[in-house]
Amino acid sequence: MSSEAGLAKQYQRKTDKQHILDNPDTYIGSVENIDADMWIYDDDSQRIVQKNIHYIPGLYKLYDEGIVNSRDHVMRMIQSPILDKRFVSYINTTVQDDGTIIFSNDGNGIDIAKHPEYDIWIPELIFGHLRTSTNYDKNEKRIVGGKNGFGFKLALIWSTYGRIETLDHTRGLKYVQEFRNNLNVIEPPTITKVPKTSKPYTKVIFKPDYQRFGIPGLSKDMVGLLKKRAFDIAAVTDHSIKKVKIGFNEDLVPVKSFQHYVDMYVGSKTETKRIYESKDERWEYAIALAPNHEFTQVSFVNGICTFKGGKHVDYIMNQITRKLCDYIEKRKKVKVSPTSIKEQLMVFIRCDIENPAFDSQTKDYMNTPVAKFGSSCTVSDGFVEKVAKMGVMDVACSLTEAKENKAAKKTDGSKTKNVRGIANFIDANQSGTVNSKDCILILCEGLSALSGIVSGLSSEDRNTIGIYPLKGKLLNVRGEQIKKIADNKEITDIKKILGLETGCEYQNLGDVHKHLRYGK
C-alpha cells in the first residue's frame, strides 16, 4: 500500500449522515439489543410494570424524538403570540404490524413557504436537513424537549422510508413529501391548495431500518415500552388551555392527570398510600413507598423521560430528605441519615425546565444546574409531615437504631480475665474468673480520689476490688441516643470493665454473676 493510500485510509472525512449511521452511540444511543429492567405498559394488567426486557436504546430514541416533538407543539401553541393559532387537541401514535410508526397532531401546521435565504421549502428544511431548528435562539426561554437541530431527522436517517404531511391553514396549503434510503433520497414535495377553513395538522411516518438494528421488527416488549411513552405524554402534557387527547393505535390513553398516571404504577389510593403536591404549572411530584426498599425515580423534563434522573430529581429529593431528617430529629430525638429515608421512597416528578441540558443526545439524565432551571420549587412542610407519617419516620428510626446497635456492639465487653487499653484503670486480680461474683468495682471522681482509694487497700483487697476514675459527671444513658452512648469513652470503658453487652438484659444476680466481670 502506498503512503498516499495509507494516509487516505487513516484520515477520512464523512458526511453528517454517514457519521450518524457509523456512530449511533453519539446520536441515538446503542443499537445493540440489550437486557434491561424497564418500565413498560402491560396490556394484561393494564398497569405500568417494571420488567426485564430486550430492547434497543437507539430505536427507542427514534420513537421518542417523534412523540416529544408532538408534545413540544402543544407547548408552542400555548406560548405562541400569533393571533391565528389553533391549540393542539390530540396527539395520536400508531405502531403498525410491519413496524411503521406514525405520529399525528393538530394545532398549527408547519409554515409552507420557501426559506428566503436557503431557497428550500421549510418542511423539507426542518425534516430533511441536519442542524436546522426553531430552538437555536439562546436568549429565548423555552420549556420544550427539542434543542440541537437533530431531533426527528435522526429517525429519518435511521429509516428506509419516511413521509411528512402538514396543512398550513394560514396559507391554505397542504404539503406532502417522502424520504427514502436513510434520507439519501428526498422526493420533491407535493403542494396543493386547500380552503383556509381547513383544520391544520401535521403527520409524520417512518419505517425504521430494522436490518441496521439487526432485528426483523418490533417485539411485544418493545411495543409495550413505546406504548408506555404515550401514557407518559398524557401525564405530562399541559392541559391548562385545552384538554389534549392522547391516542395509541386508535385507543384513547386513559390518563387524565399526573396523579392518575402515578396510579398506573402503584395502584389506586386505596391500594397504596402516596403523597402528591403541585406548586405551580411547572412542578408536580408524588411520593410512594418503594416496592423493593430501593430508591426509585420516575421523572420527566419537558416531556422527556429522564429514566436515569438528574439535577431535577436531586433538587426535590434533597429537600425531602433534609426536611425529613429535621422533622424526625425534632419529633423522635433521633438523628437519621438521608440514605435511610431515600432508600424507602419512590418519587414521581414532572417539571418544565428552561432550555434544559442533558448529558447526551439520548437525554436520559438532565444536568442543568438548579440556578438555571428558570423556576424554583419549595417542598412544603405539610408534604414532608405526610410522608413521615406514611411509615417513613418509623422505618428510618428502626434502621438507624439497628445500625447504631451494630456499631455499639463493637464496644461490648465480655467476661475475660484481662482488660487492656483503659487508662488509669486498676483491675481486680480475680475479676473475670470464677470468683467474679465477689469482685467490686469502685467508680471514683478523678485521679486524686483514685490515689486515696489505692492507698487504703490491702494486698488482699486488690484481689477483689477494681477502681476506675471518672473525669466528672457520668453521662445519664436513660433515654439517650445509642450513638451518643457508643461515642462516650467512659461508658464504653465501663462496658469493657464490667463485660456488658449491648441489648443484653441482666434480670437477676444469677445473670450478673454468670456474665459480668464484677458482682457489685
Task: Locate each region found by the language model.
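GHKL-family ATPase ATP-binding module
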Residues: 1-13, 17, 23, 31-52, ...
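Activation loop
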Residues: 16, 122-126, 490, 494
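Short glycine-rich substrate-engagement loop in P-loop NTPases that contacts/grips substrate
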Residues: 20, 489-503
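Short conserved segment of the HATPase_c
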Residues: 21, 112-132
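ABC-family P-loop ATPase nucleotide-binding domains
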Residues: 28
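Short, conserved glycine- and acidic-residue-centered signature motifs
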Residues: 119, 148, 487
